[in-house]
């Protein structure tokens, strides 16, 4: 049975984005459309949504029918969106990182081991598939990827078992990969399946998720209006670390001219952000109870104090 598509930390996202009538907003990760629809319903504003997954186009078209000129959709990865946005600027930008509930629920996409399906994991349907990767990657590189992107302490044991198995048969399904991972470390009863971290690591690597986040952040100031807000929901410690570092490095800091100066502190003009969330916000216990996918979510927000 498919889980309903529940937007993660929806109320917190709206509170930090603070949509206003007549303003324009960018939803960088359309997915099932939960954020876009909520922003459109909150006030008489405009939303442009992005997604590289062609499977979401029909859902975007339905929202377009309901909101007409207030909604626009572009099929693109957010890291590659700047040219397609044609120098358009926004009063708020939101990113909901990671895999969407819709992608997890469609068995043929190969993101989840809850169904035995083809081992794919590509968000755009293009490039190297998880099956191609898992059957060709060297053992050491595989172990490093599982450790780095999955925080998996048994990464070397898992990589060794995968390489041993593929000498006898090709690994071509999510069920088979999950079985190999479980057998390599033992199936421990608990809330989280032993294969979860390995699947997460392979997905992040296949879709180049961390580098794409860094590429987007490096250029985001060019499309955010003064006083515009940037709200990012992450699900992995490495994602959150990138966002936290970016906010810190680009946030305003009063700088005294000298310790003896009586002048008022000045602001470094290269620091163009003001952090809204002093620390990462987490979902409520009630939300996690209703939507287990929210359990690792963290939200950070900042506001542009200069316009580029």
Swiss-Prot record:
EC number assigned by the record: 2.1.1.199
GO molecular function term, any single one: rRNA (cytosine-N4-)-methyltransferase activity
Transmembrane segments: none
Gene3D superfamilies with a match to the protein in the record: Putative methyltransferase TM0872, insert domain, Vaccinia Virus protein VP39
Localization, UniProt: Cytoplasm
Residues binding S-adenosyl-L-methionine: 33-35, 51, 82, 96, 103
GO biological process: rRNA base methylation
Keywords tagged on the record: Cytoplasm, Methyltransferase, rRNA processing, S-adenosyl-L-methionine, Transferase
Identification of the protein by name: Ribosomal RNA small subunit methyltransferase H
